[in-house]
A protein has these predicted regions:
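Extracytoplasmic catalytic/substrate-binding loops of multi-pass membrane glycan-assembly enzymes
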Residues: 56-70, 76-91, 97-98, 275, ...
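Alpha-helical transmembrane segments and terminal signal-anchor/GPI-anchor hydrophobic tails
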Residues: 188-191, 196-309, 316, 321
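Membrane-interface alpha helices of multi-pass inner-membrane proteins
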Residues: 147-148, 164-170, 178-203
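Membrane-interface helix-loop-helix junctions at transmembrane boundaries of multi-pass membrane enzymes
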Residues: 172-173, 312-334
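Short acidic/glycine- and proline-prone juxtamembrane loop motifs at membrane-interface regions
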Residues: 151-155
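Transmembrane-helix motifs of polytopic, lipid-linked glycan transferases
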Residues: 22-28, 105-127, 308-312
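Transmembrane-helix signature of polytopic, membrane-embedded enzymes
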Residues: 35-37, 118-142
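Extracytoplasmic loop-helix module adjacent to an early transmembrane segment
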Residues: 35-79, 247-250
């Protein structure tokens, strides 16, 4: 594929970032309680899939190429979402002379940090389980889809880093509020509408928490109102609506989104589906018999594993199995369901869904893994 630039113009930054990444990986792992063997394995696994993604983009094209070209031109106004990624990338391209491959290694590290927080959360959920359940939980940390879609130049690596931080923060939100706030800010930069859901879910979980004092709940409710007033115009502008839009305008926007990304071999017609079917389609398709490429086939195997987890998880939920670890579960469930409704009802392209759903799946995976199996030890509190 003709690119119009040399993706290997330099690779000195790549070598430097690779070494710095290892050092930072070990330091972060120590802080969040992951052993060096696991963190190193994840690091090399993640960067391996980064290079797979890199060469795939060189051969087949992708958003990363457009981000790089726009960053070189450096004439995009400051804004959220795509504009933020372009301006952020432009600094490294135009001032530090990063090449295309250098940027992949940089964004790969952002995604890897998200994987570390995700892994730390999963380990906390499964460490009191019997061996088969622990192995099943570790499988999700090394799912190819997790590292593949979070290893490239683009919004997904930053969004997943924010997701991982929010999940880790929810395990002990009283002492990690700063991490949740940071995750909301990072998500705001790349996906403002999801950041809004993240924020509202967290505040609602505190308001509805009976353990939180009445005055604190009133305070958090006031904060939620103020933040909503400030953020809604930003989100409305970001998604392309106008202030004062009514129900019909929102409905038209959803219809437009359903057809906007309904092109290509991985597109499906979701306009005639019920909302529950849209949600199931978003989470679990493509299935193996629907795969149109090797990457879709690999993703379909991941989806089979996710289906197995959901079946096991809800079986143990109906058995009233207690979670293996304390966490702000209301926050996690609220964020998962609200985000799923928004994303599932506006995404008709399975290729886009395969990437974007990793902003919400870590929450579901943690919630279900924490209840499956028979716990060998008492429920543990995270300090």
């Amino acid at each position: 594929m003709y690119l119009g630039f040399d993706p290997f113009e330099s690779f000195y930054w790549s070598m430097f970032l690779f070494i710095i990444g290892i050092i930072l990986s070990l330091k972060i792992s120590k802080i969040i309680g992951i052993n060096y063997k696991l963190s190193s394995s994840l690091y090399f696994w993640h960067i391996l899939l980064c290079f797979v993604y890199f060469f795939y983009v060189l051969s087949n094209g992708g958003d990363a190429i457009s981000y790089f070209r726009w960053a070189v031109d450096n004439n995009v106004n400051l804004n959220f979402g795509t504009a933020f990624v372009i301006n952020f990338t432009a600094f490294f391209v135009n001032y530090l002379k990063f090449s295309f491959i250098d940027l992949f290694v940089l964004y790969n590290f952002f995604g890897y940090v998200g994987v570390l927080f995700f892994a730390a959360s999963i380990i906390q959920a499964i460490k009191v389980k019997k061996l088969p359940y622990r192995l099943f939980g570790l499988l999700f940390i090394f799912l190819p889809s997790v590292s593949f879609w979070t290893s490239a130049l683009g919004k997904d690596s930053l969004a997943f880093m924010a997701t991982g931080m929010a999940l880790w923060g929810a395990l002990n939100y009283k002492n990690r509020k700063w991490l949740i706030i940071l995750s909301i800010f990072l998500m705001l930069l790349v996906r403002p509408h999801i950041a809004f859901v993240l924020l509202i879910s967290f505040i609602l979980s505190l308001i509805l928490d009976k353990k939180v004092s009445f005055y604190t709940r009133i305070f958090m409710g006031s904060i939620a109102s103020i933040v909503s007033i400030v953020m809604l115009p930003v989100i409305i502008n970001y998604v392309g609506l106008e202030e004062g839009s009514g129900i019909d305008d929102v409905s038209d926007y959803v219809d437009k989104r359903q057809s906007y990304n309904a092109g290509g071999g991985s597109s499906i017609d979701i306009s005639s589906m019920s909302l529950p079917m849209q949600m199931l389609t978003y989470l679990f398709r493509p299935l193996p018999f629907e795969a149109h490429s090797i990457f879709a086939l690999l993703a379909s195997f991941d989806n089979i594993i996710l289906i197995l987890l959901v079946l096991m998880g809800f079986y143990f939920i109906f058995k009233k199995n207690k979670p293996s670890i304390e966490s702000n579960r209301l926050f996690l469930w609220l964020y998962f369901y609200l985000s799923l409704i928004i994303l599932a009802s506006t995404t008709a392209n399975l290729g886009i869904a395969m990437r974007q759903k990793w902003m919400i799946l870590p929450f579901l995976i943690f919630l279900l893994l924490s209840v499956i199996g028979n716990n060998e030890l008492k429920i543990e509190k995270i300090k």
